[in-house]
């Protein structure tokens, strides 16, 4: 976003060299403007009245200020719609179409880690040490593992109507085919919590780490051989379930 904004501003200033800017709030039909940006002045012709260097500098400064204000206003208008689609973005972030196995987690997970890094960078060294989960002795209640899997590993899945559908391994595109990859998170069968959740009082509770699922969109084929994009369930987390012990 920052690079795009700087590019637009530089291009905008290069156009200013062709003719001086007249400070006015009147827009003519022949005024130049970039898409999504409203101009606050009109460009006079080359043969028009001249403007001093000080006036031109002031005009350019005012223009930059107006552009920044408008971009911030547009950003505030877009954010509410982004918040409404947050759930859908999280669902679809675990699916990727690629010609090879992805080497990193989904972008949403990387952005979350980057945000945590920025938050930690703004802390003092002392606060940062105390906020480190490892230093505070924090451990996950259940051990989990995350990995990319293909349709060849899944083969079938359950859609939102409860029916079993076949997950297609490859998706046709204009230049060939791409494989569907799913980023799944499940309980680690080799972890230390395979016999119960960590930190639970076993005298009063029976605990178990269980893998839970969420819906993601994938290319599938139903029992009637109809191919289409459907929401299917995949493993997305490992949670702790508790049951109270009876007879005590």
From Swiss-Prot:
Name its cellular compartments: Secreted
Site described as Cleavage, located at 57-58
Propeptide residues are 19-129
Kindly provide the PTM information from the record: Mature BDNF is produced by proteolytic removal of the propeptide, catalyzed by a FURIN family member. In addition, the precursor form is proteolytically cleaved within the propeptide, but this is not an obligatory intermediate for the production of mature BDNF. Can be converted into mature BDNF by plasmin (PLG).
Name a single GO cellular component: extracellular space
Which residues are reported to be glycosylated? 122
Q: Which GO terms describe its molecular function?
A: growth factor activity; nerve growth factor receptor binding
Q: What does this protein do?
A: Important signaling molecule that activates signaling cascades downstream of NTRK2. During development, promotes the survival and differentiation of selected neuronal populations of the peripheral and central nervous systems. Participates in axonal growth, pathfinding and in the modulation of dendritic growth and morphology. Major regulator of synaptic transmission and plasticity at adult synapses in many regions of the CNS.
Relate the assembly described in the record. Answer: Monomers and homodimers. Binds to NTRK2/TRKB. Can form heterodimers with other neurotrophin family members, such as NTF3 and NTF4 (in vitro), but the physiological relevance of this is not clear. BDNF precursor form: interacts with the heterodimer formed by NGFR and SORCS2. Mature BDNF has much lower affinity for the heterodimer formed by NGFR and SORCS2.
* Name assigned to this protein: Neurotrophic factor BDNF precursor form
The organism is Lipotes vexillifer
Q: What is the lineage of its organism?
A: Eukaryota, Metazoa, Chordata, Craniata, Vertebrata
Q: Gene name on record?
A: BDNF
């Amino acid at each position: 976003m920052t690079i795009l904004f700087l590019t637009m501003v530089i291009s905008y200033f290069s156009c200013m060299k062709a003719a001086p800017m007249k400070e006015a709030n009147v827009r003519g039909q022949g005024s130049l403007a970039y898409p999504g940006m409203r101009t606050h002045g009109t460009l006079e012709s080359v043969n028009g009245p001249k403007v001093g260097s000080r006036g031109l500098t002031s005009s350019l400064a005012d223009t930059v200020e107006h552009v920044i204000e408008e971009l911030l206003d547009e950003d505030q208008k877009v954010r509410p719609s982004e918040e409404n689609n947050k759930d859908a973005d999280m669902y679809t972030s675990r699916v990727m179409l690629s010609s090879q196995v992805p080497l990193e987690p989904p972008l949403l997970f990387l952005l979350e880690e980057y945000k945590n890094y920025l938050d930690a960078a703004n802390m003092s060294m002392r606060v940062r040490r105390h906020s480190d989960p490892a230093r505070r002795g924090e451990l996950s209640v259940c051990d989990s593992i995350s990995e990319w899997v293909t349709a060849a590993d899944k083969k079938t899945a359950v859609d939102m109507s409860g029916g079993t559908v076949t997950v297609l391994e490859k998706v046709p595109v204009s230049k060939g085919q791409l494989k569907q990859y799913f980023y799944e998170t499940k309980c680690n069968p080799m972890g230390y919590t395979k016999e119960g959740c960590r930190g639970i009082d076993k005298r009063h509770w029976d605990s178990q780490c269980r893998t839970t699922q969420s819906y993601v969109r994938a290319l599938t084929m139903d029992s009637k051989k109809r191919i289409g994009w459907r929401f299917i369930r995949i493993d997305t987390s490992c949670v702790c379930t508790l049951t109270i012990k009876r007879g005590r």
